[in-house]
Amino acid sequence: MQHEKSLEFLQIAMKYLPEAKEQLEKSGIELSMEAIQPFMNLFTTVMAEAYELGKSDAKSETE
């Protein structure tokens, strides 16, 4: 289950990657896949925690 969610989170990140890359390049920062990898790992960790928080909140609202 967690692996499936991580893949979903990565798909979301990849959806917005071109926009992020454009904004960074406007600021003079080049973005490569090697440079982005640690941030993608951080993103999936944050998204997993946010997902669990939302899941917990939804569960407590239905009780």
From Swiss-Prot:
A Pfam match: ComZ
Keyword Nucleus tagged: no
Keyword Oxidoreductase in annotation: no
Disulfide bonds: none
GO biological process: establishment of competence for transformation
Keywords: Competence, Repressor, Transcription, Transcription regulation
Chain's role: Negatively regulates the transcription of the comG operon.
Protein name: ComG operon repressor
Gene that encodes the chain: comZ
